């Protein structure tokens, strides 16, 4: 599933081609996504794009009278293409732009979303989200407070969007490894120093992934069709049985609640 770095990579890739241009019309080939494509999107005509923002894993396209909310789901990607390039099987939505470009949404599993809203305030998908991990609001004081009485393992707690947004499975595993914290540790057992270190490495890991264009394991592509290259830097995720890059012990791979977890028994306590 595309996580925060992949969505931010998509935002940065599409923004220069959309802002200042006009949506001439939309082409919806298959509106049966996680939620049905909003009727307002079918009717788009000669609408300028004012900004392209991101909140958590949602892309937000600002229009004069409302917003398009895009979620990439499990397998979605957005590409900027020439208008004449024919659509393929899993290309479900196009925004045809006045500059000769097309924003094309591809999603083999159709678990993404294209929604329209007049205002973002109070929208159900955005209303109960925690702070952005790269913001000042996500800091050691905040994490320590939220972990203090939490009797659950730290890894699933990090992946809870009510705590902090966008730290999905890949980056939770990678950040806990970098911080030396076992994924099964109770959140309430973390010391102040461990909270400081964990916040620090989460920010570093996410920023590094954004620099590399995100992580491509299967479906994700950047807006220019290239994969994300952070997969080459993964320390534990997807490396079950391979030697830890620090101590040489085999990386452990387990599953909890249908989520794959990877860690090093030697380096993470």
Curated annotation (Swiss-Prot):
Q: Which PANTHER family does its entry note?
A: FORMAMIDOPYRIMIDINE-DNA GLYCOSYLASE
Q: Zinc fingers (FPG-type) at which residues? A: 235-269
Protein name from the UniProt record:
Formamidopyrimidine-DNA glycosylase
**Subunit structure as annotated in this protein's UniProt entry:** Monomer.
The record lists the catalysed reaction(s) as: Hydrolysis of DNA containing ring-opened 7-methylguanine residues, releasing 2,6-diamino-4-hydroxy-5-(N-methyl)formamidopyrimidine; 2'-deoxyribonucleotide-(2'-deoxyribose 5'-phosphate)-2'-deoxyribonucleotide-DNA = a 3'-end 2'-deoxyribonucleotide-(2,3-dehydro-2,3-deoxyribose 5'-phosphate)-DNA + a 5'-end 5'-phospho-2'-deoxyribonucleoside-DNA + H(+)
Q: Name one GO molecular function term.
A: 8-oxo-7,8-dihydroguanine DNA N-glycosylase activity
The alphabetized UniProt keywords are: DNA damage, DNA repair, DNA-binding, Glycosidase, Hydrolase, Lyase, Metal-binding, Multifunctional enzyme, Zinc, Zinc-finger
Name the residues annotated as catalytic in the UniProt entry.
Answer: 2 (schiff-base intermediate with dna), 3 (proton donor), 57 (proton donor), 259 (proton donor)
Cofactor(s) the record lists: Zn(2+)
EC number of this enzyme: 3.2.2.23, 4.2.99.18
Top-level taxon of the source organism: Bacteria
A Gene Ontology BP annotation from the UniProt entry: base-excision repair
Q: Which residues bind DNA?
A: 90, 109, 150
What does the sequence similarity comment in the record state about its family? Belongs to the FPG family.
**How does the cofactor bind to this protein, according to its record?**
Binds 1 zinc ion per subunit.
Instruction: Identify the Pfam families for this entry.
Output: Fapy_DNA_glyco (PF01149), H2TH (PF06831), zf-FPG_IleRS (PF06827)
What is the role of the protein in this entry? Involved in base excision repair of DNA damaged by oxidation or by mutagenic agents. Acts as a DNA glycosylase that recognizes and removes damaged bases. Has a preference for oxidized purines, such as 7,8-dihydro-8-oxoguanine (8-oxoG). Has AP (apurinic/apyrimidinic) lyase activity and introduces nicks in the DNA strand. Cleaves the DNA backbone by beta-delta elimination to generate a single-strand break at the site of the removed base with both 3'- and 5'-phosphates.
């Amino acid at each position: 599933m595309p996580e925060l770095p992949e969505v931010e990579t998509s935002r940065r890739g599409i923004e220069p081609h959309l802002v200042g241009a006009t949506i001439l019309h939309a082409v919806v080939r298959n509106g049966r996504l996680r939620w049905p494509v909003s009727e307002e999107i079918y009717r788009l005509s000669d609408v300028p794009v004012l900004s392209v923002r991101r909140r958590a894993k949602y892309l937000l396209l600002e229009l004069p009278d409302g917003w398009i909310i895009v979620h990439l789901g499990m397998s979605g990607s957005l590409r900027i293409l020439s208008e004449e390039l024919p659509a393929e099987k899993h290309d479900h939505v196009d925004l045809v732009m006045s500059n000769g470009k097309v924003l094309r949404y591809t999603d083999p599993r159709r678990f993404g979303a294209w929604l329209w809203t007049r205002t973002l305030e109070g929208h159900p998908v955005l209303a109960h989200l925690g702070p952005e991990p790269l913001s000042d609001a996500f800091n050691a004081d905040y994490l320590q407070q939220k972990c203090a009485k939490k009797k659950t393992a730290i890894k699933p707690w990090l992946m809870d969007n009510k705590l902090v947004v966008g730290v999905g499975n890949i980056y939770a595993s990678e950040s806990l490894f970098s911080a030396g914290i076992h994924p099964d540790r109770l959140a309430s057992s973390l010391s102040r120093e461990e909270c400081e270190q964990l916040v620090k490495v989460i920010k570093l890991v996410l920023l590094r992934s954004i620099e590399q264009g995100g992580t491509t394991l299967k479906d994700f592509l950047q807006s220019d069709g290239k994969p994300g290259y952070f997969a080459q830097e993964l320390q534990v995720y997807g490396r079950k049985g391979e030697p830890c890059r620090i101590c040489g012990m085999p990386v452990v791979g387990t599953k909890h609640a249908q989520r794959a977890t990877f860690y090093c028994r030697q380096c993470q306590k």
